[in-house]
């Protein structure tokens, strides 16, 4: 899977968890855990454009980012 982020960076991974891990590590000061990153990312998304991202699972979080167009899937 390949995606373009809202700021134009192209990322890729085999699973939603891979994608989330790439996004987590791109934060200037990464949170201590992937779950903590999802919580903080959800806060940033809500402040940015009002999007409410779930933090119940990595898959739900990434799917919501795709639905909100925070991530745009690129064809191979």
Regions found by a protein language model. Give the residues of each.
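Short, compact, well-ordered microdomains
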Residues: 50-76
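Acidic, aromatic-enriched beta-alpha/helix-loop junctions
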Residues: 23-55
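N-terminal acidic leader/helix
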Residues: 1-29
């Amino acid at each position: 899977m390949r995606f373009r982020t809202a700021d134009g960076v192209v990322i890729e991974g085999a699973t939603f968890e891979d994608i989330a891990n790439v996004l987590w590590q791109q934060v200037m000061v990464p949170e201590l855990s992937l779950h903590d990153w999802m919580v903080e990312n959800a806060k940033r998304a809500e402040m940015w454009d009002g999007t409410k991202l779930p933090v119940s699972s990595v898959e739900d979080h990434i799917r919501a980012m795709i639905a909100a167009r925070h991530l745009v899937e690129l064809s191979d």
